[in-house]
Design a protein with these regions (language model features):
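N-terminal interaction/assembly modules
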Residues: 1-141
């Protein structure tokens, strides 16, 4: 399984959980059938991380969704944003450009072209804020 496929599976689990499904139970069953241990570990880490940090992840999404309340976002777009925002916030080993590009590709596949542009904007703004904060902490400001 390629990392893109693992990311797609993680997004689907997050979406399932949001729609009232048992994402956690499905996760356990899915992990058994993922042949690559790194991909299985990624899926488990990111889905559990999103569930555990949901309030913080959503706070960042709302901050950069410019006049969009979280309950007005399309559910699939929100699942993609939650996955990608978590990666940007907590998984520094994944390049931000990869995270953002993969999120846009997921939006194009599962949502609309407009969603891809919206997700790109939200994540791009979030990433710029995080980069500024890193620069400030390095310079001691």
């Amino acid at each position: 399984m390629a990392r893109s496929a693992a990311r797609e599976a993680a997004m689907q689990l997050i979406y399932e959980h949001m729609m009232g499904g048992s994402g956690e139970e499905t996760l356990g069953g899915m992990i058994e059938f993922v042949p690559d241990r790194d991909d299985a570990r990624y899926i488990e880490t990111v889905t559990e991380g999103v569930f555990a940090a949901l309030h913080d992840v959503d706070r960042y999404i709302v901050a950069f969704a410019q006049d969009w309340a979280i309950d007005r976002l399309a559910r699939v777009d929100l699942a993609i944003l939650r996955l990608a925002a978590y990666e940007l916030l907590c998984m520094e080993d994944i390049p931000a450009a990869v995270t953002i590009n993969e999120a846009v590709e997921l939006a194009r596949k599962y949502s609309t072209e407009q969603s891809g542009a919206f997700i790109n904007g939200v994540l791009g703004n979030l990433n710029r804020k995080l980069e500024r904060e890193k620069d400030e902490s390095r310079s001691g400001l």
